[in-house]
């Protein structure tokens, strides 16, 4: 792994409580300092309206289960086996609904007051030196593949971080870049960007630039004529910076990797050429930053994100320093937002409703989940230290007289142990005069074998052994007793790029679901953390919802097959329209979709966005989650291994935004990946079932059959055809990347033929 310090802090990293002065002045007691944050719960009436709506859906699910149990032979001629399968699936759906009601029961949001970071008695023109007690921040950026994550993407991320507004930023902000792909191009691009940063950072602060990623700032919509001061000095500076950025882009794009290695530009990479490309744990950057700058706060960022709010760190400090008890903010997570996001979220991966409804509800329990990027961590929480660690615990758990326990936990580096001791016990770090003096130490602690025999990867740092180490790390921090906070700012603190197209989206969801499944069946299960640690019960339930996403796949797949099965075999799994029980599933269908629709309306989203997300939930469940479930099942049997798959990033940071003529970025695209086979097969099967059922009705062959399917089964098949319409279009009309490849069609057709044959025998 190559770790590059893009900028380094040279001042003290003293941790603070973030307040004003203390004591009295002239015998008079000082008033309390103004609050840095405000907890704002949802209004009582609105909160109870949402609770009752969620409970209504849950009660209808329970009523449907009761109907199944009372009519266990399937009602008017229904098959008991089919009803039992439906009962099991609906019981699972009821359990998920109950978990969702619990998670969303007490929604809370926090409003930050960065202007109150100025201590009492100071004017708004307070100088940077007067912010001396604000802690330093180490900013950790991760990239993995120079092809899918071009170097210019990483460069823009780093430049936006270096230009953040923060008092004494040159001393208190440090940026570390980890390239798991070991690319000389990425290292060369960062070296080139260092010179540009020397002019870019002062330019941003001098003119109050809002968006500090150059590729966004210099877009056509951000020209000097459309915003900013129009004086001659600004125009000259703007033109100069634009020319310099264009030169930087050309130098990076025109660099050849082989030429770098041949002429000595890649001398640092010879030992890394055979390193496996994978999602390397963020622990390496944690250790390197610890022996160099050792800031008490760490910001973790993916390489495809950039700073969208230059005061993001100040907002985070309001939440990290604004509580009476440090346990209230072990980490601060910013919601994921995306630039140039497609209208109405056609691929269901922007997750706005998830953050605004689900995560806001979890904030009322133990706090937001760690999302893997855009998160401010207390270093001591990442080190596995419980909140409010006191002197008595120091003697018992780590040992203050000798470094034996520190060596066991953190390894044999004296410098790393000293830095860990300072963080754990809230001591001031010694000012570092020369960063270069720690280069050899940094190389030592970043070695691949350094963590052998230590607690790194389990009790210390980011957790090893999972494709979703972010969720696992956040859960471990919560299990120690820490809480977390969701930082919602206007404008959003950070912006990233969302995958576009079917292959990229489904690959990303499959990777997440695989990691979530592995956590569920491991010793890191949140249920065990609740039983033996300090993870709260309702927080455990919230984790189970997210970790249980891939476990929904077999139940949703079985339920989706019931409609076609019943039509093809002349059976029913739902009450007939003439029966009293028909009103229960009908009311459930209407109430669930209405409740879900109103959630999207409350989040300020459109009806089309609701439909796109509902449709994608069905597609993701049958495709990405199903394959993830099978992958983990095979791994648990020792028949396969999970592999980390890097998701391609938006190339607009690195290309000239030249889109293919006539391309529709919101339309589903396909390739020959196995993830498309299950959905294609289910779409074909439902079309076949509707066609067969319609023919039976038209020709009267279903008359007189007591257990013939009713309108409920036809509605289920028709609804799934609507949900899978992108695949139907890809099967029938799609061409090129918009059409499903013949290899996928043939495999899906084989599955459909096997299912139809099975139905004929039953």
Swiss-Prot record:
Functional summary from the UniProt entry: Thought to be a Golgi-localized beta-glycan synthase that polymerize the backbones of noncellulosic polysaccharides (hemicelluloses) of plant cell wall.
Keyword set, alphabetical order: Cell wall biogenesis/degradation, Glycosyltransferase, Golgi apparatus, Membrane, Transferase, Transmembrane, Transmembrane helix
Biased composition regions of type Low complexity, renumbered to the chain: 1-15
Organism: Oryza sativa subsp. japonica (Rice)
Parts forming coiled coils: none
Full protein name: Cellulose synthase-like protein H2
Localization per record: Golgi apparatus membrane
EC number: 2.4.1.-
Topology relative to the membrane: Multi-pass membrane protein
Record's keyword annotation contains Ribosomal protein: no
Cystine residue pairs: none
Catalytic site positions: 180, 470
Chief localisation class: Golgi
GO terms for cellular component: Golgi membrane; plasma membrane
Segments of this protein annotated with the region Disordered: 1-39
Family per record: Belongs to the glycosyltransferase 2 family. Plant cellulose synthase-like H subfamily.
Record field: transmembrane: 47-67, 81-101, 541-561, 582-602, 619-639, 673-693, 708-728, 739-759
Statement: the UniProt record of this protein carries the keyword Plastid: no
